Amino acid sequence: MKFAILFGGNSYEHEISIVSAVALKKVINQNLEFIFCDEERRFYHIPSEKMNSKTFSTKAYKKEKELFIQQGGFFSKGFLKENKLECECVINLIHGGDGEDGKIAALFEFYSIKFIGPRLEASVLSFNKELTKLYAKSVGVKTLDYTMLRKGQNSKEKLRFPCIIKPARLGSSIGISIVKDEKDLEYAKDVGFEFDNDLVVEEFKNNIKEYNLAGCVINDKFVFSIIEEPKKKEFLDFEQKYLSFSGHNELIEANLSEELKEKLKDSFKKIYNPLFKGALIRCDFFILDNEVYLNEINPNPGSLANYLFKDFSTTLNTLADQIPLEKMIKINYNFLHSINGQKGKL
């Protein structure tokens, strides 16, 4: 399978997406194409040998061939004709906005481009933490109780401390604050509202444990990664979450009973099916008093969570093989033909 990796985007996680693409290049041992989306949403074809941080930090990528998107794929302008970028499947590796909020999914679906990643509806529901909680509840998966704070509105609801405040529409740990008492609340709100107009507030639980599970559906069967127990801090910050996929953090496989492992997998299945078909996702769960709670859905996890799989390359290739393209509607204009000769025709 010939893959193209799409990365970058107009996102707070733009640089992390670059790191993720470089990391994935080292993991997938096959011929790859690299498509960089800059902050102005222009696409560039990056040669494999130039996939390094300097290419992007110095804006040297602007010297590379610019691509444009149209029906069936990415193209560049040639002397006499347009040249199509040869790839069989695009991996959506844009983290945060653009890649996870539905923009790229809509673009690919519109132009009939085969891709690994969440589709439009899945993107919308997983990118907004409030909608994620509502979706989880609808499929029978628990989440922690929460309160919403809206910019410009005075909430009359009494908050319990300590609490954790998160921007509703950010794909990572950006803008998150742990508030231990009321005197720190206004500052935390100001930080959160810098990134989003809606904030999710949850009671902070000291005795809670976090577990990560990635997977996908291939040929109607679930393929799961190992279950990871992240190193424990108050919460994983931006740098911690994304250095793990580059091999800088020690992977800790969770020491759980078979009963709890099955509970996690069952919750994952409820979240995934059928909404996330065609995507390899990671779900971050909490376990509290032997009950499983969904924390968040990562529809485009860092380097697609390769570090959690025993045979990541086979999983990725097999997933790509079975992704169908949306069937196009055939327009025959029969109705317009039928009224074409009538009096008072359109």
Swiss-Prot record:
Q: Which InterPro entries does this chain map to?
A: ATP-grasp, ATP_grasp_subdomain_1, D-Ala_lig_Van_CS, D_ala_D_ala, Dala_Dala_lig_C, Dala_Dala_lig_N, PreATP-grasp_dom_sf
Write out the GO biological process terms: cell wall organization; peptidoglycan biosynthetic process; regulation of cell shape
The Gene Ontology terms for molecular function here are:
ATP binding; D-alanine-D-alanine ligase activity; metal ion binding
Q: Which residues bind Mg(2+) 2?
A: 296, 298
Highest taxon, organism lineage: Bacteria
Tell me which EC number(s) this protein carries.
6.3.2.4
* Annotated binding of ATP, by residue: 159-211
Q: Pfam families, from UniProt?
A: Dala_Dala_lig_C, Dala_Dala_lig_N
Would you tell me the Gene Ontology cellular component terms? cytoplasm
Cofactor (UniProt): Mg(2+); Mn(2+)
Question: Entry's Gene3D superfamilies?
Answer: 3.40.50.20, ATP-grasp fold, A domain, ATP-grasp fold, B domain
The listed locations are: Cytoplasm
Pathway info: Cell wall biogenesis; peptidoglycan biosynthesis
Which residues make up the binding site for Mg(2+) 1? 284, 296
According to the record, cofactor stoichiometry and binding are noted as: Binds 2 magnesium or manganese ions per subunit.
> What residues does the ATP-grasp domain cover?
133-327
Enzymatic reactions? 2 D-alanine + ATP = D-alanyl-D-alanine + ADP + phosphate + H(+)
Instruction: Report the coiled-coil segments.
Output: none
**EC top class, in one word?**
ligase
The protein's matches in HAMAP family, at most eight in alphabetical order, are given as: Dala_Dala_lig
Q: What family does this belong to? A: Belongs to the D-alanine--D-alanine ligase family.
Its biological purpose: Cell wall formation.
User: What is this protein's record name?
Assistant: D-alanine--D-alanine ligase
